[in-house]
């Protein structure tokens, strides 16, 4: 094969590389748009509640993703430690997704329900009070900072534009649902659970008050992770699954 021209002309070599990489990318990526099980259809998945979404925003803002992944790989040691391997469907409403394998702390894909709200509140305030060997910084200001939910409806509308299936009812009640999720045994809380099945309703930071704190939001988000899919009924079989 005559390749002298490529060796002597860096621009031509660059163009050749781009062409080859483009063809390889198309061959591998394009078929995924026609494969039904690229993202599994999994029962139970729903958009985040307004409080969970606010907590996720705080999770990203504080850089939690730098030390914690949310992707359990199919390796035996990870499945035995953390639980069922992560499904693509579990991240389908994440913008941006929280995948990764670099961990300073444990993976959080299945942390929901593993610890109590009080444990999370104390751990986020002073990690070494519960885990002496922890290198995680504390976030005591979250409990004292009132959650600003004035733009929550606009946030959900933006997410809807990129494919998150928020209904008009969800959008209309966005700010109301922030309060409802920290108000157990109320009519509004019942309406919230109707809109968002399996949503946990509690005063997550264990402090009195009628308005959510940033700590409420972050704990609500953590307590939801990994709880939506019922793996007792999940069938990982399909014509396109490998």
State each model region's role.
Residues 71, 138-140, 223:
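A mature extracytoplasmic/lumenal domain signature
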Residues 67, 133-139, 229-237:
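Surface-exposed patches in mature extracellular/periplasmic domains of secreted proteins
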Residues 55, 61-70, 120, 218, ...:
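The canonical Cys-X-X-Cys-His
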Residues 1-48, 184-190, 194-195, 221-242:
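Post-cleavage N-terminal segment of exported redox proteins
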Residues 13-22, 80-214, 242:
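Electron-transfer interface patches adjacent to heme c in soluble/periplasmic c-type cytochromes
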Residues 36-60, 72-75, 79, 104, ...:
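Electrostatic cytochrome c docking/interface patches
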Residues 62-66, 71, 104-107, 135:
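Short pre-active-site segment immediately N-terminal to redox-active cysteine/selenocysteine motifs
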């Amino acid at each position: 094969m005559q390749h002298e021209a490529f060796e002597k002309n860096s621009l031509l070599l660059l163009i050749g590389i781009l062409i080859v990489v483009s063809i390889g990318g198309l061959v591998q990526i394009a078929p995924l748009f026609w494969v039904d099980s690229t993202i599994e259809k999994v029962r139970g998945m729903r958009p985040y509640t307004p409080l969970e979404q606010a907590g996720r925003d705080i999770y990203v803002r504080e850089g939690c993703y730098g030390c914690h992944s949310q992707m359990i790989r199919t390796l035996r040691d990870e499945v035995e430690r953390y639980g069922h391997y992560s499904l693509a469907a579990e991240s389908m409403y994440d913008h941006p997704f929280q995948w990764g394998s670099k961990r300073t702390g444990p993976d959080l894909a299945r942390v929901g329900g593993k610890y109590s709200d009080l444990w999370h509140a104390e751990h986020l305030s002073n990690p070494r009070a519960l885990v002496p060997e922890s290198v995680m910084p504390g976030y005591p200001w979250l409990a004292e900072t009132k959650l600003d939910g004035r733009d929550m409806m606009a946030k959900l509308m933006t997410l809807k534009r990129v494919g998150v299936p928020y209904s008009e009812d969800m959008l209309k009640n966005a700010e109301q649902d922030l309060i409802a999720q920290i108000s157990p045994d109320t009519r509004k809380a019942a309406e919230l659970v109707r809109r968002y099945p399996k949503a946990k309703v509690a005063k997550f930071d264990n402090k009195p008050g009628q308005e959510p704190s940033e700590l409420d939001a972050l704990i609500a988000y953590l307590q939801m992770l990994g709880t939506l899919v019922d793996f007792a009924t999940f069938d990982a079989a399909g014509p396109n699954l490998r």
